[in-house]
UniProtKB/Swiss-Prot annotation:
Residues 51-129 form the RRM domain. InterPro entries: Nucleotide-bd_a/b_plait_sf, RBD_domain_sf, RRM_dom, snRNP35_RRM, U1_U11-U12_snRNP_70-35kDa. Component of the U11/U12 snRNPs that are part of the U12-type spliceosome. The keyword Ubl conjugation applies. This is U11/U12 small nuclear ribonucleoprotein 35 kDa protein. One of its GO terms (molecular function) is RNA binding. Its main location: nucleus. Keywords: Isopeptide bond, mRNA processing, mRNA splicing, Nucleus, RNA-binding, Spliceosome, Ubl conjugation. The gene is Snrnp35. It comes from Mus musculus. There is a cross-link at residue 172 (Glycyl lysine isopeptide (Lys-Gly) (interchain with G-Cter in SUMO2)). The lineage of its organism: Eukaryota, Metazoa, Chordata, Craniata, Vertebrata. GO terms for cellular component: nucleolus; nucleus; U12-type spliceosomal complex. Pfam families: RRM_1 (PF00076).
C-alpha cells in the first residue's frame, strides 16, 4: 500500500466508481458505459494543457472580466475561456484558464480552490481531458467528483479523492437470541434518540469535508510526489506530440 495515492494518475472507470479504488465489479450502469466508451479529446481545443486550470461551480452570472480579475492575482493569464451554451450564449458555470508560467498555475491551484466569487464557492483543478490518460467525460459515465443527489459519484480526483483502503479481518457473528427484555430495552433506547436524518447528514458532511481537506493539503505536504506526477504528465504529452 506504499504506492497508494489519493489522486488518480490514470483514469480507470472501474476504480473511479469505487470510494477506495478497489472495486472489482461495476456497481452501476454508468460505470459499465464508461468502461465500454472510447473517448478522443477535442482536437480543436488550443493552449498548453499542462498550464491550464479547470474552474467549476461558477455563478451563472459571473463574467469573463470577473474571472480575469480574480485569477490574474496569481500570475499572467495567456487565455481564459468561460464555456457558454452554443444556442443561448448563457454560461454553463465552468471555465478554463491557461497561465503563462507553471508557478502561477500551481499558486492558483493551491489558493483559488474554495474561493467565493459572486456568492458561489468555486472548485479549481487541473485540466484533465488532455492530461489524464484514459479520461472519460461524465456524459459517457466517467468524470470525477459529483454530488450524492446525482447518484453518479466518481472518486480519485481533488473533489473526492480515494480513501485509503482498510483491510479488516471478516468476523462472522454467531447466532444470538435476544430475550424479550433486551429487545424491549433496545427499542426504548432507539425511540428516545430517534433522529436519523440530521445525524446521518452531519456524519456524511464531516467525512466529505475531512477527505476534501486532505486532497487540498496533499500537494503542499508532498511536493516530491506532486513534481513526479506533473513530470509524468509532461512526458506523456511529449510522447503524444512525437507520435503525431
Amino acid at each position: 500500500m506504499s504506492d497508494w495515492m489519493p489522486i488518480a494518475k490514470e483514469y480507470d472507470p472501474l476504480k473511479a466508481g469505487s470510494i477506495d479504488g478497489t472495486d472489482e465489479d461495476p456497481h452501476d450502469r454508468a460505470v459499465w458505459r464508461a468502461m465500454l466508451a472510447r473517448y478522443v479529446p477535442n482536437k480543436g481545443v488550443t493552449g498548453d494543457p499542462l498550464l491550464t486550470l479547470f474552474v467549476a461551480r461558477l455563478n451563472l452570472q459571473t463574467k469573463e472580466e470577473k474571472l480575469k480579475e480574480v485569477f490574474s492575482r496569481y500570475g499572467d493569464i495567456r487565455r481564459l475561456r468561460l464555456v457558454r451554451d452554443l444556442v443561448t450564449g448563457f454560461s454553463k458555470g465552468y471555465a478554463f484558464i491557461e497561465y503563462k508560467e507553471e508557478r502561477a498555475l500551481m499558486k492558483a491551484y493551491r489558493d483559488a480552490d474554495g474561493l467565493v466569487i459572486d456568492q458561489h464557492e468555486i472548485f479549481v483543478d487541473y485540466e484533465l481531458e488532455r492530461t489524464l490518460r484514459g479520461w472519460i467525460p461524465r456524459r459517457l459515465g466517467g468524470g470525477l467528483g459529483g454530488k450524492k443527489e446525482s447518484g453518479q459519484l466518481r472518486f480519485g480526483g481533488r473533489d473526492r479523492p480515494f480513501r485509503k483502503p482498510i483491510n479488516l479481518p471478516v468476523v462472522k457473528n454467531e447466532p444470538h437470541r435476544e430475550g424479550k427484555r433486551e429487545r424491549r430495552e433496545r427499542s426504548r433506547s432507539r425511540d428516545r434518540h430517534w433522529d436519523p436524518r440530521p445525524r446521518e447528514r452531519d456524519h456524511d458532511r464531516g467525512r466529505e469535508k475531512h477527505w476534501q481537506e486532505r486532497a487540498r493539503v496533499w500537494p503542499e505536504n508532498d511536493w516530491e510526489r506532486e513534481r513526479e506526477f506533473r513530470e509524468e504528465r509532461v512526458k506523456s504529452r511529449d510522447k503524444r506530440d512525437r507520435s503525431k
